[in-house]
Amino acid sequence: MTVNTENNRLTASFGGARLIVEPWGESSVRVRMYPALCDIAEDERLSSSPYYSALTEQVSHNCTIRSEEVDTTDPWYKGDEYAQYHQTGTDYYLTNGKLTVKLDNEGRMSFYNQRGEVLTEEYWRDRNRINRYCVPLRIVARELKPRQGGTDYEITVRFEAYDNEKIFGMG
């Protein structure tokens, strides 16, 4: 995964897709996903509108991006084996007002409030890391599929379900 942190936004490229997370109003973000070969400049329709300019100017001073190096070594390695198989990765955080988006070293997104409590996170079930949910279903949180007979794409996004959750503005 390759991550770029320019222009107050996170841009991650991986698996034939490009993910963009950017501030969008006060304490909110806009998340977009494109096929890797798609030219994003062609799809920046909102960027020329006065509404977009007002949104980006309003949050430009409230948005911060930071990165943190994390240990990704599997937990069963101890002692000399740990040193031999030691790995690190980088987690990225975009904070806009009271909302923080974490993009971890494997490309998984999670959303936190100002107190650091998880609001929601993407629903991934695969066999990539055995110390997490390890199921043979290979359910990914984001699927980008081309629509038959055209140049458009359809995206399916999955999030974890929590008791008493309230999610607004998706769709």
Per-segment meaning from a language model:
Residues 1-171:
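N-terminal accessory segment at the very beginning of proteins
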